[in-house]
Every structure is written in C-alpha cells, then in structure tokens.
C-alpha cells in the first residue's frame, strides 16, 4: 500500500451536473431520432435493419464520451427495471398459480409447478399430475428451492414480493430518467475507478453480503430448521407448542424475539455482547463449518451458508477500504498498473502496463470485454457448483432442475465469453490508438500475434485429430468385433490420472485446508452417497476412459472457439491480407469489389464464427453432463443400499464410440420427446419439431448469397408493379452481414430450443 501526502488525493467536488433535457415522448416516438440518416424515415427496407443495429450502438449516436457514458448508465437502470418486472412475474406465478405450499409440505413426492394451462380446446392435457392433487406444468427453474431457502412459507409472502418487485421496477425507471434528463453524472465520476471500487466492494458486495447474512441468520435459519425437522418426522417444540406443519412456523417478524431464536440456537442467547468481548465461539452453533450435505434435504447446511456470507462480507468490506480517494492513503490503480514491468529475466517489459489505465477508463468496450470474460467464466463455475455443492434444499433430487440449471449457466457463460471477444475487438477498432501503446504489454501481444495464433492453431489440429481419432479407432474396432483392441476401461485403459489426483486431493485435504470442517467439501470428490427420499442427492463421480476421451473433445472445441475469437481481436485493426482493416470498421462483408478472397475477415465475422463453435463446445459439455449423471450418479436407492441408476451405468462402455453417442444417448434418450404425443409432455414434442424447423430455417440464410435474394425480390417487385400495388418503401435483400446475423440467431435459437425439449421431455419422464 502506498501512503502519500494528503494533497495527492483529490478534494471532494460535485460530480453531477444539473441538466435541462426533458424526457419527451415526442422525441422517443420518432423512430431513428438518434441518427440523422435514420431520422429521415425509410426509403428502403434496409432502414428497419439499420434501426435495430444502431439503436443501442451509442458510439454511433455521438463521439462525446460523457454523453455515451450517461446513456449507458441510464440504460443500466432500464435493464434493472426489466429484471424486476421479470422477477415480479416469477413471484406472481408462485403466489397465484403454484403448488408451493403443497411442495413445502412434501418436497420428496410433490413436483414443483407454477403454471396451470387453461382449457381452450384440449390444452389441459399439458397439466400433469404433480402430486397431492395438483395438476399443472412442472417447472425446472429451482425457484421453489430458492424460496424455501429464503424462509418463504406461504403464497402471501410471494404476492408481497411480486408487488415489491414492481415498485422497485418503477423506482429503477425513475432513476434512469432522473440521471439522464435531470441530474447526470460528469465524465470524471464515471472515470473515478478508486471510488467505484471502494463503493462497489464495501457497499454492494460487502454490506450486501452482511445484510444477507442477517436475513439468513434471523429468518432463513430458524424457518428452515423447523421445516427440516418436520420433513424428518421429528418436529421441534417452540414455546411449548409443537411445530408440526409449515403453517405453525412463526412469521419472520416474530423472530425479532431473541428468546424464540435462542430456543432453536442457544448461541443467539449470548446477544451482541459476545461479539464485542471476543467470545465468538458462543456463536458456533449457527455460524458453522460442517461441510458436506444436510442428510434431510440433500443440500449444504444453512448455518454453513450463513457463515460463508459473513466471511465474504468481511473480506469485501476490507477490500472496499483499499483504494485512494479524497484522503491520500491507499492504492492507486494507475500506479499499480504502471508498476508492472514484467519478469526481469523471462519477460522484461520496461513499458509494462503503461497506457492501460487510460485505455480502460476511456474505452468502455475494453472495460466491458474484461467484465464479460470474468462474468461468463463465473457463470460456468456456478454451473459446476450447483450439482457438486447443491445450496438449496431438495434441489439435488430434482433431476430436471439440475439439468436445467447446469445447461442454463453453461450457455449464459458461453454467450458472455463470446461477447467479451466482440467488445474487445470493438475496443481495438474504435478506441485503440497505436501511438499511446508503444511497447507496452498490449502492443507486445499484438506484435507476437502470429506466434500466438499459429501455435494455437497447431494445438487445435493436434487435439482435434487425436481426440476424434480415439473415437474413430474405437468405432472401427467395435465394428470389426475386436473389443480387446479398443480404448476402454476393460481393454486399453486411458485413465484420467490428473483428474483422479485432483479428486483425491480434495477428498484428502478436507481436514488440512479447513481445520474445523467436519466433512469434505463435496461428495462428488471421493465422498459417499447421500440419499434423500430414496433418490441419490449426491455421490462420488468415478472417472474413466470415456471421460478422458470426451474431455479431450472439450479441450479441442474450447481451443477452436478461443482460436477464432482471439484471432478476431488480435487482427481486428490490420492483417497482411487487409492492412487498413481498422478503417473498414467492426463489421464489413469483404474488402470491397475487385479484391476476391477477402470475405469473412471482419472482427464481426470472427464473433459470428465463434458463436457456432461456442454452441458446438457447450452442446458436448451438456450432453456429457446429462448422460454421465444419469448413468453413474442419479437414480433410486434400493433397500439394501445399492443404487439403480437411470441409464444403468452405460456411459463407460457406450460413450467411447461415435456410434455409442448417437445410439445410446441421442437416439435412446429422444424416445420420450418423440413419443410425447397424447401425454402431458406433448408440448415438448411440438417444440422439438418446431425448433428443428427454426434451426433448418437458419440454413437458408447461411447457405445462400445476397444476390440470389435481390434477384428474386426484383422479379416479385416487377409483379407488384404490373398489378399497380408497388410498395412506397423499396424492398431490398438483407445485406451480407445482416443475413449472417439472422442466420446465426436462428441457428442458436433452434439448436437451444431443440436441446431444451430433448432434455426436458426425457428427464421429466424418467427423472
């Protein structure tokens, strides 16, 4: 930490400007008001596409960084308003159309539902039997499990949340208008990163986690302890009254009574005095370090979760006091960056990170790229933890929800990471000034780009041929009837020794890394089977040859995705083929007429191609997860303790050939969606067909050129002219880039919705 004389800190001054810029619907109601050319109105049908392309591209509206910053800031509030409206809808469905109370009363037999289809002409077939006499559509979002963890015990509370979320949405819309049209922050406020870090770390994350800890301790902990006791058939007694049903549980405000809490957790009786006297051990009954899962609910211990949030709060509150603002103490991000000079032996860089502070505070695309890469990676980490360390009660035995949440968080992560590459490339084109980056780390990476990309390309070729080659070998050997010559657990073994070592390390280290923990961090690492309601909630995940092989397919597809995206960023400004690429912008179809072979070189085209490989990568990841869990983890527990897995452990022997994946996974597990007609999952059958159609529709845009359509349009316009019904707005074919955008959008939408239907129809029936 650097301590400097007080004059180094900036003095407090107003960072908000009062603006007289009234919000008028007259202006908003005019399409294209943000762009001179678009504001003139449509002459051709291209106008509507340009309207969509540029509406949120604030850089194209103005070059004033302060104005762009204010628009982004205001849009954030609009986004938050949409999120609150969406949340309100979820709460409202829970309050009005769900079996939440029925599920709380018997979570191992009742399935969660928050939607009832009204009969028009037979649609009520979609309402399946959810148990306890409720007919509806099964939901797989995990919301019931989350609500139980919050301590919600009835539908009235959900209705209050629904109303509260709408109020919050109104406040957010108001804030968005206020901070753009009435009192708008100055550019220096947006660029004051130390203040932002302090407030976001200490305030948002630190105090946010601390207040959430308070809720967990004073509401969630007592409520869920009483519910767990009811579910275990051993109800607890409060004030001499047996809490035999959810309706008997005191409401949250009643837990303000400390004596009530102390009956459940004696540590609450110690009061606040124990905190200030340093007698923190008094709180050890509700701030625990148990590890493992609660055997009643198959989820992490609520007291562990509360302890975790308290620790996070302390860390972030400390972190939020580290950066230098009005007082001359603390870190300066600019000084930290400019102090980085590389490794003197391996990578000496005298200019190090010089210029990066200015780049990151004047290019919001560069800032966004870093944030998207981090958030996308975090989403993928969340996907892994939701099954390995399930945080919410009974979620681990709700297999449809487990597959749904894994798939959802993987795809969200993939889209965000591709977005990171997109905005990094935009930053390079619109915001990067080569004169300000001479021999710093960014410049050095750009100078080394040929070595980086050619080596990465070699890695992709190596991984692709070797991983796919193992499968081709196995398919061939199996076809020739030579199982002894196959790569498999029973013939030529390819054990994932590094993965097994990491699994063992985590299992063995539980006592040493967390000295007071009573159990390992996760049962998936050489733990034991946790069964809830006769179903497997968690179990060790054995890894073998089949996992080793598909892991290398993952490595291959991820590396190709990175190759495409990284090439797009590193060659965004220029290349040997097109030295003046930066002048052509982020998206362009080709380098003008007369230069053949220069199509699909724009940074936008790399994002376009990267999206296909991202989809490719993650399809294999979610297929691997879905099949592996059904084969080796999930299932029913027999009376003798043995486990009957959903697909009877067929992964190890079937997933080692291409034919096995096609026959024993895709084809076998599509049986439910293909045979869904006439049952309550028939909507997924229709979705499966419809989404295949959307996917096939995308190929029309991807496989045909613009000229074909322009020619067709001109003959159709001729016919309209003959009949004297010619349109005033001239029809035009989509541009090359627009066609590709429509194509990839439908490709992904069709593919994702097909997978959604395939997974749901199957696991809702067998899970």
Curated annotation (Swiss-Prot):
Q: Which residues does the record give as chlorophyll a binding sites?
A: 700, 708
Localization: Cellular thylakoid membrane
| MF terms (GO), sorted A to Z | 4 iron, 4 sulfur cluster binding; chlorophyll binding; electron transfer activity; magnesium ion binding; oxidoreductase activity
Topology class, membrane: Multi-pass membrane protein
Q: Indicate which residues the UniProt annotation says bind chlorophyll a'.
A: 692
Single GO biological process annotation from the record: photosynthesis
Which PROSITE patterns would you find in this protein's record? PHOTOSYSTEM_I_PSAAB (PS00419)
This entry's comment on the bound cofactor is: PSI electron transfer chain: 5 chlorophyll a, 1 chlorophyll a', 2 phylloquinones and 3 4Fe-4S clusters. PSI core antenna: 90 chlorophyll a, 22 carotenoids, 3 phospholipids and 1 galactolipid. P700 is a chlorophyll a/chlorophyll a' dimer, A0 is one or more chlorophyll a, A1 is one or both phylloquinones and FX is a shared 4Fe-4S iron-sulfur center.
Q: Tell me the enzyme class.
A: oxidoreductase
Q: Which GO terms describe its cellular component?
A: photosystem I; plasma membrane-derived thylakoid membrane
Q: Keyword check for Cell cycle, yes or no.
A: no
Chain's role = PsaA and PsaB bind P700, the primary electron donor of photosystem I (PSI), as well as the electron acceptors A0, A1 and FX. PSI is a plastocyanin/cytochrome c6-ferredoxin oxidoreductase, converting photonic excitation into a charge separation, which transfers an electron from the donor P700 chlorophyll pair to the spectroscopically characterized acceptors A0, A1, FX, FA and FB in turn. Oxidized P700 is reduced on the lumenal side of the thylakoid membrane by plastocyanin or cytochrome c6.
Subunit composition and interactions: The PsaA/B heterodimer binds the P700 chlorophyll special pair and subsequent electron acceptors. PSI consists of a core antenna complex that captures photons, and an electron transfer chain that converts photonic excitation into a charge separation. The cyanobacterial PSI reaction center is composed of one copy each of PsaA,B,C,D,E,F,I,J,K,L,M and X, and forms trimeric complexes.
Under which name does UniProt file this protein?
Photosystem I P700 chlorophyll a apoprotein A1
* UniProt lineage: Bacteria, Bacillati, Cyanobacteriota, Cyanophyceae, Synechococcales
